[in-house]
């Protein structure tokens, strides 16, 4: 750590006039998460669920920060249709496309900070990053979710919009996740 609790490389994004971008991914299933709620005394609230469902969605979301600019949240859902042999998560090409879209939306260089997921270190993605002068990739230490602000977004979603909800269809799950992310995306101040 540098002076004042800031890492020595903490000025990399500022020196390049770049956006500081944290990225993470999460999966959400049709099975509702439990949260505390209230009800009249003697009446326990019950959320009814129609059987088990393997259908789920994965979401990759970069959060983008730059002094003097409004922070941004960009997200891409990926639906898992429940196929046993189909890909359930993002491929390196999906991440490449997400980074290209983020670069176009932000209109400037990116210093990307993400975890050590094996797909993040794939040869194709590494070659892509090396061939782009607008992209610098740094990795978080292993098992350090507290250093990634996107983890807080997943926590807000799970504790808020997705808690105690029985999703009737995968589309209902996707609509609810998007609604929660939009609310977080355009929230002017923390509550």
Model regions and ranges:
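Short functional hotspots at interaction and active-site rims
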Residues: 1-191
